[in-house]
Regions:
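Active-site groove signature of glycoside hydrolases
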Residues: 4-12
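An active-site-proximal structural segment forming one wall of the substrate-binding cleft
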Residues: 1
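A structural motif corresponding to the C-terminal lobe/cap of the Radical SAM core domain
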Residues: 15-21, 25-177
Length: 177
């Protein structure tokens, strides 16, 4: 790719680091290829399994930025959301610190309006987003898509306003529930 004029690539794999041994082997292969390309890992870094060795491997392989799906700044919401049943706000803070210590920039993704969210827990998320030392944040409003546990729960509670699937777009100005 470098010979074709490319200087950077983005790795977008939701489960890239779920098997850290494999992720480290991929990083080692990139490093051994002596590519001059830099890259980012736009998703796939789980805060509950992040460790120093992983970030050092990523950095050595040319990765300069990772993104974390923090989702919420409230542990109860994280547990209800099902972030592996293990992710916590403290682990998120630790993961960002480890990335930074390895010389890697960090982005954070947040969601509000999760099924367990309240006004107070959404404020926790806002407060967390303001204090976590990341370079960029993205905040999304959660949408209960058909086929998800959230959607099924909302149907049971009578909260779904439309069953017209064409209205289920990621970005919409209409109230869906």
């Amino acid at each position: 790719l470098y010979d074709l004029g490319y200087r950077e690539f983005m790795l977008a794999d939701d489960i890239f680091t779920s098997d850290q041994k494999w992720a480290t082997e991929v990083c080692d292969a990139i490093y051994k290829s002596k590519t001059k390309m830099i890259w980012t890992c736009t998703n796939g870094i789980r805060v509950e399994s992040a460790d120093d060795n992983l970030f050092k491997s990523l950095r050595r392989a040319g990765c300069y930025r990772v993104s974390f799906g923090f989702e919420s700044g409230n542990d109860k919401v994280l547990k209800a959301f099902g972030k592996g049943g293990r992710a916590t706000v403290e682990q998120a803070r630790k993961a960002v610190k480890l990335a930074r210590n390895a010389g890697i920039d960090a982005n954070g993704y947040f969601m509000v309006g999760l099924s367990a969210d309240t006004k107070d827990t959404m404020q926790d998320t806002i407060d967390f987003a303001r204090t976590i030392p990341v370079d960029m944040i993205k905040c999304s409003i959660s949408i209960a898509f058909p086929g998800t546990v959230m959607f099924d729960n909302y149907v049971k509670k009578g909260l779904i306003r439309s069953f017209d699937w064409d209205e289920y777009m990621i970005y919409t100005a209409k109230d869906l529930f």
